[in-house]
Design a protein with these regions (language model features):
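Secondary-shell segments that build the walls of catalytic and ion/ligand-binding clefts
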Residues: 168
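N-terminal accessory interaction module
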Residues: 1-42
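Residue-level recognition of alpha-helix initiation/capping sites
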Residues: 22, 66-68, 171, 196
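Active-site/acyl-donor-binding loops of N-acyltransferases
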Residues: 1-2, 6, 43-64, 186-268
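Conserved acyl-CoA
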Residues: 25-35, 171-187
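A conserved beta-strand-loop-helix scaffold within acyl/acetyltransferase catalytic domains
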Residues: 1-6, 39-48, 57-165, 174, ...
Length: 268
């Protein structure tokens, strides 16, 4: 399995659910070779066990299975939007305005337009797919998917808030699920439970029939960070304020890791 460093932690290099079990010596080796401060992965748990950590997945989709309210919202999106596959160059040229509007709306940083274009062009070949939603001819939303055999990951979804009233997210998710899950027989995933920021997007996906694939959460640290985590953990409730968001996230993950530790055993 390949690994990469994300936000200071070494994590599996995949967008799809994976459930490795490592021995303590394997963990120490990965930390030493990578230079990361922490190692994070998701061991398996016994079938039928519910945990506070999970992957969001959708193995089956049918429009008629949605609630009446969801069906109405999808219909509104279908009537007001046009969902289409996009060529990489099309998204590179038109997508930055949508990205900028979405990030400004949520108070996030905005990359330079040329940086965005280079990143999209670099993803121009499979396994990447690009989808767009046009409202009155304008690109109001887009998604990036990664397709591998019988599975697909929803990697990116951005919506220009100016088009919220057109229900682009509903039209787009319906089209993606119909194409990949209902007709393509693939399982769609949207990564693991979000712990680093407040979001209701995964709750939105649950309304489309996504489910929770439960697992444990394992965190391993360098000796110095392990000492700091043990020291701060009893006082985690005091980590308040916007500037301490990363600390709260780490303590929340540590809490989950401790609660799921009895449910799995490491490799010998």
């Amino acid at each position: 399995m390949d690994w990469y460093i994300y936000a200071g932690a070494l994590v599996p290099l995949t967008l799809f659910p994976v459930f490795p079990r490592l021995s303590p010596s394997e963990e120490r080796k990965l930390l030493k070779e990578s230079g990361a401060l922490a190692l994070r992965y998701t061991p398996p748990v016994p079938p039928g066990t519910e945990t506070p950590f999970w992957y969001v997945v959708c193995p089956h989709y049918a429009f008629d299975d949605l609630s009446a309210k969801m069906r109405n919202q999808v219909r509104r999106g279908r009537s007001r939007c046009v969902v289409e596959r996009l060529a990489p160059e099309t998204l590179a040229e038109e997508g930055w305005a949508c990205l900028r509007a979405a990030r400004v709306h949520y108070g996030e940083g905005v990359p330079e337009e040329e940086t965005f274009r280079k990143e999209i062009r670099a993803q121009g070949d499979p396994p990447f797919e690009f989808w767009g939603v046009r409202v009155g001819g304008v690109l109001g939303a887009y998604a990036i998917c990664v397709v591998e055999g019988d599975r697909v990951a929803l990697s990116v979804l951005k919506i220009d808030p100016a088009f919220f009233d057109a229900y682009p997210a509903y039209a787009l998710m319906d089209a993606l699920l119909e194409h990949h899950v209902a007709r393509g027989g693939r399982v769609m995933s949207n990564g693991a439970r979000s712990v680093s920021h407040e979001t209701n997007f995964q709750d939105f996906l649950l309304k489309f029939g996504f489910g929770q694939q439960y697992c444990a959460l394992r965190l391993a640290y360098t000796p110095l960070l392990a000492l700091a985590v043990r020291g701060f953990y009893p006082w985690r409730g005091l980590l308040r304020g916007k500037g301490l968001a990363r600390g709260r996230s780490l303590m929340f993950q540590e809490e989950i890791a401790r609660s799921t530790a009895p449910l799995w055993s490491p490799n010998d």
